[in-house]
C-alpha cells in the first residue's frame, strides 16, 4: 500500500449544492479525527462540524469513513459531503494539505484499488467507461464489464490454457510413460476450439469498441446535393449553413446524435468537385478522408437532376465495399424514379422519407455495434493481447517439437493475462489511469 494519503474532489467542479471530497491512505483515520474532533463510527453517516488545524470551523457536513481493506481502494478511506461553494471546497483543500495530505492524480483512487487487488484492469477500465457513458447501451456494456463479465471469460480461457499446458508438460517430462494415445489428439482439439472461441470474441470486440467510442457517419455528395439540409434535419437544428450557392460548405461540420442507444457523430462535408480554389479543394480532400474512415457513408444525390449513373457505386470515390446508404434528396421536386428500390428518397423540406431514413440509420447503428451475449473486448489493447494469444495458439498447433508447443501455450496464457493486468502491464498502467478524472 502507498504511504501517502491523497484527496480529491469526487463530485463535479464548480458551484453546487453538495461537494464530495474523497480521501484514501494510511493517514485517513487521523485526518478524520482532526477534522471532526472525534472519530465517527465507520460505515455510518455522521453530521459533524469540520475544523482546520487552527480550530476554525470550515463547514458542517456528513462524514463517512471506511477502514481498509474493506473499502473501494483497499486502504482506509473517507468521504466528506460538504456544501458545494468554492470557498468551502478551497478551505477544506487547504486544511487537508496542512494535515499532510496531497491532491490525487488522475485515476489514482482506482489505480490503488487495482494495485490492492480490489479490481482487475478490465474492471478499472469499466469504471472510466461508466463515467464517460453517454447512452444506455454504453452504460449497460460498462456495467457488464464492471461486474466482472470479461474477467470471468478470461479466467475460463486461462484455466483451459493452464490445463492444456499441464498435460503438455507431462508429455515432455515423461516421454516413456504409457499415456493414452488420445491425449495428444485431445490437446490439439482443445487448442483449436479455444482459438476459434477467441477469434469470435475478437470479432465481437471490434463492435463493442465502436459502441464505447461511438460511430462516424459521413455525408458525401456533389455541391448542392442537399447534404447540409440533411444534416440539419437529422440533427433537428441549424448546424450547417444552407445556400443555393455551390461550395458553401468548405470544412467538415460535426453534430452528435444518439441512434438506437449508440452515440453517432454525423459529419457534413464539402461538395465533391474539381476546383481551382485551394480552400475548396482542401475541403474536398478532407471530405474524402472522413468518408474513408467512416463507419457508414451517406451518399447523397439530388434526385431532381440525377441520372442512373449518379447512383452507381463505381461513380463514387473510395472503396465500393464501403458500408453506405444511397440517398436521393429533394424528392419534393419533379424527378424520374430510380430503378433501384434500395435508394432512400427524402425531402428535408416536407419531411417525406425522413422517418424511413432515421429507421435505417438506427438499424445500421445496431448492426455495427451489436454483439452476442457475453462480455466483449471493449478496447484496442484487449484485442491486441488476444490477437497475440491467437497467434501463439496457431504456432502451438504447427509446432513440431513438444517443447516449442509448450512454450507457445505459455506465451498465449501470458497474453490473456495482460488483459486483466495479471502479467506484464507496468508499461500501460500510466496510460490506462491517466484517462480517468481527478477523484476517481
UniProtKB/Swiss-Prot annotation:
The keyword Cytoplasm applies. GTP binds at residues 224-229, 243-249, 268-271. (6S)-5-formyl-5,6,7,8-tetrahydrofolate binds at residues 22, 79, 118, 440. GO terms for biological process: tRNA methylation; tRNA wobble uridine modification. GO terms for cellular component: cytoplasm. Binds 1 potassium ion per subunit. Keywords: Cytoplasm, GTP-binding, Hydrolase, Magnesium, Metal-binding, Nucleotide-binding, Potassium, tRNA processing. Its main location: cytoplasm. Mg(2+) binds at residues 228, 249. Its EC number is 3.6.-.-. It is found in: Cytoplasm. Its cofactor is K(+). PANTHER family: TRNA MODIFICATION GTPASE GTPBP3, TRNA MODIFICATION GTPASE GTPBP3, MITOCHONDRIAL. Exhibits a very high intrinsic GTPase hydrolysis rate. Involved in the addition of a carboxymethylaminomethyl (cmnm) group at the wobble position (U34) of certain tRNAs, forming tRNA-cmnm(5)s(2)U34. Homodimer. Heterotetramer of two MnmE and two MnmG subunits. Belongs to the TRAFAC class TrmE-Era-EngA-EngB-Septin-like GTPase superfamily. TrmE GTPase family. NCBIfam families: mnmE_trmE_thdF, PRK05291.1-3, small_GTP. This is tRNA modification GTPase MnmE. The lineage of its organism: Bacteria, Pseudomonadati, Pseudomonadota, Alphaproteobacteria, Acetobacterales.
Amino acid at each position: 500500500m502507498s504511504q501517502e494519503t491523497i484527496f480529491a474532489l469526487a463530485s463535479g467542479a464548480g458551484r453546487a449544492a453538495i461537494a464530495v471530497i474523497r480521501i484514501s491512505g494510511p493517514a485517513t483515520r487521523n485526518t478524520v479525527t482532526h477534522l471532526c474532533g472525534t472519530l465517527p463510527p465507520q460505515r455510518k453517516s455522521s453530521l459533524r462540524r469540520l475544523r482546520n488545524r487552527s480550530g476554525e470551523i470550515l463547514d458542517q457536513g456528513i462524514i463517512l469513513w471506511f477502514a481498509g481493506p474493506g473499502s473501494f481502494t483497499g486502504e482506509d478511506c473517507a468521504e466528506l459531503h460538504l456544501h458545494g461553494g468554492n470557498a468551502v471546497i478551497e478551505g477544506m483543500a487547504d486544511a487537508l494539505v496542512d494535515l499532510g495530505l496531497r491532491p490525487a492524480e488522475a485515476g489514482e483512487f482506482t489505480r490503488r484499488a487495482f494495485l490492492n487487488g480490489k479490481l482487475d484492469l478490465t474492471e478499472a477500465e469499466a469504471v472510466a467507461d461508466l463515467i464517460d457513458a453517454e447512452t444506455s447501451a454504453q452504460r449497460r456494456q460498462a456495467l457488464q464489464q464492471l461486474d466482472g463479465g470479461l474477467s470471468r471469460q478470461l479466467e475460463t480461457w486461462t484455466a483451459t490454457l493452464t490445463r492444456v499446458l499441464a498435460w503438455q508438460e507431462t508429455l515432455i517430462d515423461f516421454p516413456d510413460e504409457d499415456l493414452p494415445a488420445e491425449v495428444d489428439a485431445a490437446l490439439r482439439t482443445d487448442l483449436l476450439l479455444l482459438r476459434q472461441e477467441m477469434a469470435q470474441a475478437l470479432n465481437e470486440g471490434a463492435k463493442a469498441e465502436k459502441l464505447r467510442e461511438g460511430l462516424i457517419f459521413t455525408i458525401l455528395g456533389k455541391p448542392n446535393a442537399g447534404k447540409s439540409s440533411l444534416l440539419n434535419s437529422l440533427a433537428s437544428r441549424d448546424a450547417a449553413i444552407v445556400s443555393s450557392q455551390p461550395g458553401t460548405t468548405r470544412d467538415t461540420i460535426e453534430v452528435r446524435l444518439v441512434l438506437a442507444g449508440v452515440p453517432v457523430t454525423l459529419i457534413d462535408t464539402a461538395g465533391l468537385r474539381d476546383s481551382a480554389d485551394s480552400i475548396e479543394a482542401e475541403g474536398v480532400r478532407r471530405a474524402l478522408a472522413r468518408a474513408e474512415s467512416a463507419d457508414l457513408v451517406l451518399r447523397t444525390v439530388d434526385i431532381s437532376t440525377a441520372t442512373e449513373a449518379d447512383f452507381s457505386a463505381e461513380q463514387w470515390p473510395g472503396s465500393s465495399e464501403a458500408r453506405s446508404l444511397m440517398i436521393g434528396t429533394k424528392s419534393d421536386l419533379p424527378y424520374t424514379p430510380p430503378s433501384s428500390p434500395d435508394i432512400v428518397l427524402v425531402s428535408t423540406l416536407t419531411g417525406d422519407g425522413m422517418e424511413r431514413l432515421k429507421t435505417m440509420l438506427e438499424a445500421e447503428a445496431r448492426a455495427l455495434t451489436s454483439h452476442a451475449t457475453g462480455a466483449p473486448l471493449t478496447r484496442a489493447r484487449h484485442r491486441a493481447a488476444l490477437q497475440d494469444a491467437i497467434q501463439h495458439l496457431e504456432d502451438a498447433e504447427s509446432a513440431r517439437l513438444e517443447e516449442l508447443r509448450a512454450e507457445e501455450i505459455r506465451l498465449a496464457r501470458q497474453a490473456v493475462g495482460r488483459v486483466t493486468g495479471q502479467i506484464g502491464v507496468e508499461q500501460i498502467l500510466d496510460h490506462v489511469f491517466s484517462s480517468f478524472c481527478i477523484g476517481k
